[in-house]
UniProtKB/Swiss-Prot annotation:
Catalyzes the sodium-dependent uptake of extracellular L-proline. This protein is also capable of using lithium as the transport cation. Also catalyzes the uptake of propionate. Its main location: membrane. The chain crosses the membrane at residues 6-26, 42-62, 68-88, 127-147, 163-183, 193-213, 235-255, 276-296, 320-340, 371-391, 398-418, 428-448, 449-469. GO terms for biological process: proline transport; short-chain fatty acid transport; transmembrane transport. Changing C349S: Does not affect proline uptake activity. Sensitive to N-ethylmaleimide. Na(+)-dependent proline binding activity is similar to wild-type carrier. This is Sodium/proline symporter. It is found in: Cell inner membrane. The gene is putP. Changing R376 to E/Q: No change in activity. PANTHER family: SODIUM/PROLINE SYMPORTER-RELATED (PTHR48086), SODIUM_PROLINE SYMPORTER (PTHR48086:SF3). It comes from Escherichia coli (strain K12). It is a multi-pass membrane protein.
């Protein structure tokens, strides 16, 4: 496809803007705490949109609309499950984790928090969790780089190899320079761009088809099953789709946003902003695919690319319905979704190496300046490994991404949830929950028992493991229980009246 000048200019301005934010954040990064968690200074608006953007990758603008375009409204069960899971995560985990990480050695990372929370002198929790993060997030990063390369390849007519570097370069640069603040500030801009694209596009599609009623009739005429929420689904399938929401409790890049909030009181306001953003974005993505059925049914001559690859439904609608300047802005939203998730994952990998391996085992007394530069170098190293994996988009290792979400959700989810909710939890309980949750996901995936998504049994068995091994072993030390009680009391302290929860 020949790229228009307006679209090229729009993409370049957008990418330059993200790099500029990285340089601005660089000036605010004084120490390693700033580089990894932004000095715990994020207000509710940035916390909310950064958490949302880091969660929603290119799947939001390509995968979900494409699935709905192919199969109808029944594909929206996953969006319902994600919404419920995210809300419960904000409600039960976000504020508590913000407080508990501060009370446990002012932990900067999830492995660091586990070590402090459970007084793990053996540091086995730190090692296992850091290695799990490093392994799966490097693969996640590779998947994000492939998505960015595909966008540049199809939009600019580049070769895949050129697109690979072009798509990754800007994200690597602003993450390297500005660290957590750059990632969070760019996430906020990117989240705003994503919601703009996902609200505007379906509205224009509906208008172009003749209104909501006419669009719905066209969709029904094509196939009545398009409007059937239960099309081809049994109870297990619905539970499996909704089970995706359990993954939120264990995603390190999302949990890092909670840890970086300026106060646990601001989490209440952040939750409202984030959930509003998420519901509107998911509804918009479903609407793009759903009403795209009507548009391309009325314009079959324009449906060639979409019929070959349903995930292009948003791209094609943007290019057909809008002038090149607006189309460039809308297509930048896909790049925003990819960049926001990739940058967060690069930073989490970097922090796992720098804080949980380099500082913990090699250079305990390293200076703040040294740690910041090691963190920056690790961003480059992880990015280069991810690019090497992404060089062959057919690489089978990239298939691991399909259940890495389940792996994190089952291995870390129950541990995080119980750690902030139950004072009797012990190190052995945490270790058992992590191992049982991860192994269940791996084994269940191989055998596919009952057709049930592996995160559900993984989460259940991991939770059981935590309870059983915690109760069988020695009770937590008096110091551990006192620290938990103090953190819990702090969490339940009265918030300022303007943020008081209803």
């Amino acid at each position: 496809m020949a790229i228009s000048t307006p679209m090229l200019v729009t993409f370049c301005v957008y990418i330059f803007g993200m790099i500029l934010i990285g340089f601005i954040a660089w000036r605010s990064t004084k120490n390693f705490d700033d580089y990894i968690l932004g000095g715990r200074s994020l207000g509710p608006f940035v916390t909310a949109l950064s958490a949302g953007a880091s969660d929603m990758s290119g799947w939001l603008l390509m995968g979900l609309p494409g699935a709905v375009f192919l199969s109808g409204i029944s594909e929206s069960w996953i969006a319902i499950g994600l919404t419920l899971g995210a809300w419960i995560n904000w409600k039960l985990v976000a504020g508590r984790l913000r407080v508990h990480t501060e009370y446990n050695n002012n932990a900067l990372t999830l492995p660091d928090y586990f070590t402090g929370r459970f007084e793990d002198k053996s540091r086995i929790l730190r090692i296992i969790s850091a290695l799990v993060i490093l392994l799966f997030f490097t693969i996640y990063c590779a998947s994000g780089i492939v998505a960015g390369a595909r966008l540049f390849e199809s939009t600019f007519g580049m070769s895949y190899e050129t697109a690979l570097w072009a798509g990754a370069a800007a994200t690597i640069l602003y993450t390297f320079i500005g660290g957590f603040l750059a990632v969070s500030w760019t996430d906020t801009v990117q989240a705003s761009l994503m919601i703009f694209a996902l609200i505007l596009t379906p509205v224009i599609v509906i208008i172009s088809v003749g209104g909501f009623g006419d669009s719905l009739e066209v969709i029904k005429q094509k196939s009545i099953e398009n409007v059937d929420m239960l099309k081809g689904l049994n109870f297990v399938a619905i539970i499996s789709l909704m089970g995706w929401g359990l993954g939120y409790f264990g995603q390190p890049h999302i949990l890092a946003r909670f840890m970086a909030a300026d106060s646990h009181h601001s989490i209440v306001h952040a939750r409202r902003i984030s959930m509003t953003w998420m519901i509107l974005c998911l509804a918009g993505a479903v609407a793009v695919g759903f009403f795209g059925i009507a548009y391309f049914n009325d314009h079959p001559a324009l449906a060639g690319a979409v019929n070959q690859n349903a995930e292009r439904v948003f791209i094609e609608l943007a290019q057909i319905l809008f002038n090149p300047w607006i189309a460039g802005i809308l297509l930048s939203a896909i790049l925003a979704a990819v960049m926001s998730t990739l940058s967060c994952q690069l930073l989490v990998c970097s922090s796992a190496i720098t804080e949980d391996l380099y500082k913990a085992f090699l250079r305990k007394h390293a200076s703040q300046k040294e740690l910041v530069w090691v963190g920056r170098v690790m961003v480059l190293v992880v990015a280069l490994v991810a690019i090497a994996l992404a060089a062959n988009p057919e690489n089978r290792v990239l298939g691991l991404v399909s259940y890495a979400w389940a792996g994190f959700g089952a291995a870390f989810g129950p541990v995080v949830l119980f750690s902030v909710m139950w004072s009797r939890m012990t190190r052995n309980g945490a270790l058992a929950g992590m191992i049982i949750g991860a192994l269940t996901v791996i084994v269940w995936k191989q055998f596919g028992w009952l057709g049930l998504y592996e995160i559900i049994p993984g989460f259940i068995f991991g939770s059981i493991g935590i309870v059983v091994f915690s109760l069988l072993g020695k009770a937590p030390s008096a110091a551990m229980q006192k620290r938990f009680a103090e953190a819990d009391a702090h969490y339940h302290s009265a918030p300022p009246s303007r943020l008081q929860e209803s």
